[in-house]
Swiss-Prot record:
It catalyses: L-seryl-[protein] + ATP = O-phospho-L-seryl-[protein] + ADP + H(+); L-threonyl-[protein] + ATP = O-phospho-L-threonyl-[protein] + ADP + H(+); [DNA-directed RNA polymerase] + ATP = phospho-[DNA-directed RNA polymerase] + ADP + H(+). Residues 395-404 have a biased composition (Low complexity). CDD domains: STKc_CDK9_like. This is Cyclin-dependent kinase C-2. Gene3D superfamilies: Phosphorylase Kinase, domain 1, Transferase(Phosphotransferase) domain 1. One of its GO terms (cellular component) is nucleus. PANTHER family: CELL DIVISION PROTEIN KINASE, CYCLIN-DEPENDENT KINASE C-2. Residues 337-513 are annotated as: Disordered. Its EC number is 2.7.11.22, 2.7.11.23.
Length: 513
């Protein structure tokens, strides 16, 4: 067998031998992710006390053995060794059906469980985003973006496409290190590859226009579009292209980047779905207009990432040389970043669901047991020698018992009801303004989410809070076509878009060429 050249992968080698140790060597502590073909647990190695992440590969959907996506992920991860790529430590097995699988249908004739053992990471970007009140500083954004691009450049040099870059697949530890994770959709490629590749990859909000238009021949540029969406999300404080369907996703891209034609994207008219999904009217590019509040160097880099024509899109290596990373404030040292309580998207999603459940239960309880209304009517008054009770209230001008009283004269500025004034004249600005009146973007520091001044460089909190969706991370699930789920590749369902052509975002696609 031919040896791979230095710095290149040899994907012709057989998959690594696993199963030398049992999962009983680990104690499961807490579930931190879940996806279509697996769960992820934080676990402790009993002998050493080391904390790891155990990703269980679900076998009940596979009739003839090991899932091809898991084989591909293992082969790639065993050969990628970089500080910004998640480390697969080993494979362990469980000889029989786990307690987690009791009662579940089993279509696989091969019994037992298989686990991938990863280094443990404290957070993913989506989990941090759900922490209220936290924001990234400009040096933090630069630090994380630099690590993301460095890891992705390493993958591309080694001819690996990630094909699912999104916040929940970017893992961060409490030493500030960011690592690419969830290589379940990754695959090797070569520039002279003549076969077709699937376009059913990359979560919808981060999917580039060429895939949405049906391209089956593509390269590293697809990952760079996703990086551009992440970059803008960090600067803007929320996802920039939250489409619900493929048509809506393309429309959002057109509204931001302009509608494609032969002048700005040669050959686009020959794309398989161009005629069915082209813009109904010509649209101009508005990236600079919409994000004019961004730092000048940040906007220049973003413009080069969000280019419709993939052949003109900036590559990871050139992005690392952009002025953005070499002007003040410079990227901070990862070790200078603050530490946070563990923030896995799977966990934060469960907390949000529990809060919604509690709120709904409280509303239901209130409807079923309304508070008793107490009468506020004054007691009846009886005059001396009167045989009948006097009316409780004097008759109004239109009451049948009052035939003589003229209708009241309503003075200007008052509000009358039944002949009696209610309230005073309208008061302008009755409630003083409160909260952030500047729109939420820190123009002074150029890059955070809120209007206040940033904390000292390198000590800020992560980027803003807001609804998020699936979890990715260690590769628990295949493409998460809506944004939600569990870290390490888990993908529970939360609401980050939908995959109109594949059902739920956690749909198992099996073989992904």
């Amino acid at each position: 067998m031919a040896a791979a050249a230095f710095g290149q992968l040899n994907l012709e080698e057989p998959p690594p031998i696993w199963g030398s140790r049992s999962v009983d060597c680990f104690e499961k502590l807490e579930q931190i992710g879940e996806g279509t073909y697996g769960q992820v647990y934080m676990a402790k190695e009993i002998k050493t006390g080391e904390i790891v992440a155990l990703k269980k590969i679900r076998m009940d959907n596979e009739r003839e053995g090991f899932p091809i996506t898991a084989i591909r992920e293992i082969k790639i991860l065993k050969k990628l060794h970089h500080e910004n790529v998640i480390h697969l430590k080993e494979i362990v097995t469980s000889p029989g059906r786990d307690r987690d699988d009791q009662g579940k249908p089993d279509n696989n004739k091969y019994k037992g469980g298989i686990y991938m053992v990863f280094e443990y990471m404290d957070h993913d970007l989506t989990g941090l985003a759900d922490r209220p009140g936290l924001r990234f500083t400009v040096p933090q954004i630069k630090c994380y973006m630099k690590q993301l691009l460095t890891g992705l450049h390493y993958c591309h040099v080694n001819q690996v496409l990630h094909r699912d870059i999104k916040g929940s697949n970017l893992l961060i530890d409490n030493e500030g290190n960011l690592k690419l994770a969830d290589f379940g959709l990754a695959r090797s490629y070569s520039h002279d590859h003549t076969g077709n590749l699937t376009n059913r990859v990359i979560t919808l909000w981060y999917r580039p226009p060429e895939l949405l238009l049906g391209a089956t021949k593509y390269g590293p540029a697809i990952d760079m579009w996703s990086v551009g969406c992440i970059f803008a999300e960090l600067l803007n404080g929320k996802p920039i292209l939250p489409g619900k369907t493929e048509n809506e996703q393309l429309n959002k891209i057109y509204e931001l980047c302009g509608s494609p034609d032969e002048s700005n994207w040669p050959g686009v008219s020959k794309m398989p779905w161009y005629n069915q999904m082209k813009s109904s009217r010509p649209l101009k590019r508005r990236v600079r207009e919409i994000y004019r509040h961004f730092d000048r160097h940040a906007l220049e880099l973003l413009e080069k990432m969000l280019v419709l024509d993939p052949s003109q899109r900036i590559c990871a290596k050139d992005a690392l040389d952009a002025e953005y990373f070499w002007t003040d404030p410079l990227p901070c040292d990862p070790k200078s970043l603050p530490t946070y309580e563990s923030s896995h998207e799977f966990q934060t999603k469960k907390k949000r669901q529990q809060m919604r459940h509690n709120e709904e239960a409280a509303k239901k309880q209130k409807l079923q047991h309304p508070q008793q209304q107490h009468s506020r009517l004054p007691p009846q008054q009886h005059g001396v020698g009167q045989s009948h009770a006097a009316p409780l209230w004097p008759a109004g001008p239109n009451h049948p018992m009052n035939n003589n009283a003229p209708p009241p004269q309503i003075p200007a500025g008052g509000h009358y009801y039944g002949g009696k004034p209610r309230g005073g004249a309208p008061v302008p600005n009755r409630y003083p303004p409160s909260g952030n009146q500047t729109g939420g973007y820190n123009n002074q520091s150029r890059g955070g989410y809120s209007s206040g001044a940033y904390p000292p460089q390198g000590r800020g909190a992560p980027y803003g809070a807001g609804p998020r969706g699936p979890s990715g991370g260690y590769g628990v699930g295949p493409p998460n076509y809506s944004q939600g789920g569990g870290q390490y590749g888990g993908s529970g369902g939360s609401g980050r878009g939908q995959n109109p052509m594949g059902g739920a975002r956690n749909q198992q696609y099996g073989w992904q060429p």
